[in-house]
Regions:
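A structural boundary/capping signal
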Residues: 3-240
Length: 240
């Protein structure tokens, strides 16, 4: 037991060192899948990540198969929806609290969603973004108060993807009316494209909240500090 405890402590230190480097990296240097699996192992040191990586590989291959060399916006977004929701069966979890966060802590993490195929706005969006990074598709995370969605953005071609609604597309005006109060509409953070690093910053805020709710205050502070360092203009981070 003491050896296992020592190994866990060593792994924890190594994971935290790697995560602490993220604010200093360029987005192009960050592997989103690898980082999200690190965060999952930080939560559950016994986690086996190979089956999770295999699941992502299957999704990536399915998107490639659905695309068949098409590169127009409609074909790309359709291929993503088909692979993630229709074929693999990923859905919005029905067990959520008043803010829309899963009551099952595991479903706040990538591993929990990949195992149950149920997630919430943030990690369902992250699934799109992982595939986007693997296939060089211009996808971006888009933040709102208590919500997060995906935007395909290639110059003049732009389409929003609502991961909690089977990949349905809604205009920016829909999100503005639904999620932004009058004082938030001029905020420079909301409804803007986030790069990979900024997206992780938004996710770190949510992870900090999970640890805080589980009375792990030091770990909560660790993630919230990272979040604030990456996204200082995010109100959500400051509120948490």
């Amino acid at each position: 037991p003491s050896l296992a405890l020592s190994l866990n402590t060593t792994n924890e230190i190594l994971i935290e060192k790697e995560l602490e480097n993220i604010p200093d990296l360029k987005s192009s240097q960050i592997d989103l899948l690898k980082t999200l699996l690190l965060i999952s192992r930080h939560w559950d040191p016994s986690l086996k990540t190979q089956p999770l990586q295999d699941e992502i590989k299957k999704l990536v291959l399915d998107v490639k198969h659905n695309l068949k060399d098409s590169n127009d916006t409609t074909s790309i977004t359709h291929a993503l929806r088909m692979a993630i929701h229709n074929n693999a069966g990923y859905r919005y979890t029905e067990q959520v609290d008043s803010r829309g966060y899963p009551t099952n802590n595991e479903e706040l993490f990538l591993h929990g969603m990949l195992e149950t195929k149920r997630g919430y706005c943030m990690n369902l969006s992250l699934l799109y973004l992982i595939i986007g990074q693997k296939l060089d598709i211009p996808l971006f995370g888009v933040p709102l108060p208590n919500h997060f969605f995906v935007r395909y953005d290639k110059g003049k071609d732009q389409i929003n993807i609502e991961a909690t609604e089977m990949g349905t597309s809604f205009p920016d005006s829909f999100y503005g009316q639904r999620y932004l109060g009058s004082s938030e509409k001029d905020n420079l953070y909301f409804l803007k494209n986030l790069n990979t690093k900024q997206t992780l910053g938004a996710y770190f805020s949510n992870i900090g909240m999970v640890y805080y709710q589980n009375q792990k205050v030091e770990r909560a502070i660790f993630y919230l500090k990272l979040s604030t360092k990456i996204n200082p203009s995010s109100i959500d981070t400051q509120n948490n």
